[in-house]
């Protein structure tokens, strides 16, 4: 991304991929309870197994959902699905974020990056990352959504148990369930998030409003998080419902969206908007700040080692 000073050592592709993966994992660990609350709110009155989640317990708002989960199922439940979440970031975020600059440079061929090249880079890296990381997304959402209260025995006892059961009962295609809505969602997220961050950071630095440092990264990340949440929320809700559904509950992604619209109205597509924004906003801040700092420190360390030898 933009903003390297002449004294900086340009980060290599390996450094970018590694930094993106580590930064995304740090952000996931800190913000995971918000993501779990978002999933529970999005699932809402969807049927899980043979029991209506809403008939067992109701969640009110982000904080209310987190408190209710902690009280009724234990604080550990807020981190249910975290191992799959971290696996997802290692296989997903490291590619979509770490390869963004490299792919963008490929499209520009030495020229100044245009909006088209930024969008193209976001589309390509996001699409590839989704396909590779989809099984981890399916397992993460299933574990976050299942409740241990007022219903049948939980479908999964842990991360690897979930992988095994899904592959056994639904086939390998079950691990890629919801790829279409997730691809749509993450193409939107990747383009909006990275392009908005890139443009905002570039504008702040070029107009000398902020230096290319933590405050600049913070502001750019907040703006990127808000824009991304607005555009991706409807697709995110449909994706969560479809991925978490029992076999045969929905015949297709459009069928899932249509049933949501007819049963719950248009507002259903924005369920969990507040936790989504809190999650994306805070996740973006932590991830981008860590990402930028890691890149700089790793390249400084490498430069120091090269000079020493």
From Swiss-Prot:
Entry keyword annotation includes Secreted: no
InterPro entries for the chain: Mit_carrier, Mito_Metabolite_Transporter, Mitochondrial_sb/sol_carrier, Mt_carrier_dom_sf
Residues engaged in binding fatty acid 16:0: 60, 271
Subcellular locations according to the entry: Mitochondrion inner membrane
Segments in the Mitochondrial matrix topological domain: 33-77, 136-180, 235-268
Membrane topology value: Multi-pass membrane protein
Main localization, broad class: mitochondrion
GO BP: adaptive thermogenesis; cellular response to fatty acid; cellular response to hormone stimulus; cellular response to reactive oxygen species; mitochondrial transmembrane transport; proton transmembrane transport; regulation of reactive oxygen species biosynthetic process; response to cold
PTM characteristics: May undergo sulfenylation upon cold exposure. May increase the sensitivity of UCP1 thermogenic function to the activation by noradrenaline probably through structural effects.
Catalytic activity: H(+)(in) = H(+)(out)
Solcar-type repeats, residues: 11-106, 113-203, 212-297
Keywords: Ion channel, Ion transport, Membrane, Mitochondrion, Mitochondrion inner membrane, Oxidation, Repeat, Transmembrane, Transmembrane helix, Transport
Molecular function in Gene Ontology: cardiolipin binding; long-chain fatty acid binding; oxidative phosphorylation uncoupler activity; purine ribonucleotide binding
Annotated GO CC locations: mitochondrial inner membrane
One Pfam family this sequence matches: Mito_carr
Modified residues annotated as Cysteine sulfenic acid (-SOH) in this record: 256
Transmembrane spans: 11-32, 78-100, 119-135, 181-197, 215-234, 269-291
Mitochondrial intermembrane topology ranges: 2-10, 101-118, 198-214, 292-309
Known regulation of activity: Has no constitutive proton transporter activity and has to be activated by long-chain fatty acids/LCFAs. Inhibited by purine nucleotides. Both purine nucleotides and LCFAs bind the cytosolic side of the transporter and directly compete to activate or inhibit it. Activated by noradrenaline and reactive oxygen species. Despite lacking canonical translational encoding for selenocysteine, a small pool of the protein has been observed to selectively incorporate selenocysteine at 'Cys-256'.
Described function: Mitochondrial protein responsible for thermogenic respiration, a specialized capacity of brown adipose tissue and beige fat that participates in non-shivering adaptive thermogenesis to temperature and diet variations and more generally to the regulation of energy balance. Functions as a long-chain fatty acid/LCFA and proton symporter, simultaneously transporting one LCFA and one proton through the inner mitochondrial membrane. However, LCFAs remaining associated with the transporter via their hydrophobic tails, it results in an apparent transport of protons activated by LCFAs.
Subunit structure: Most probably functions as a monomer. Binds one purine nucleotide per monomer. However, has also been suggested to function as a homodimer or a homotetramer. Tightly associates with cardiolipin in the mitochondrion inner membrane; may stabilize and regulate its activity.
Family affiliation: Belongs to the mitochondrial carrier (TC 2.A.29) family.
Name of the protein this chain belongs to: Mitochondrial brown fat uncoupling protein 1
Organism: Bos taurus (Bovine)
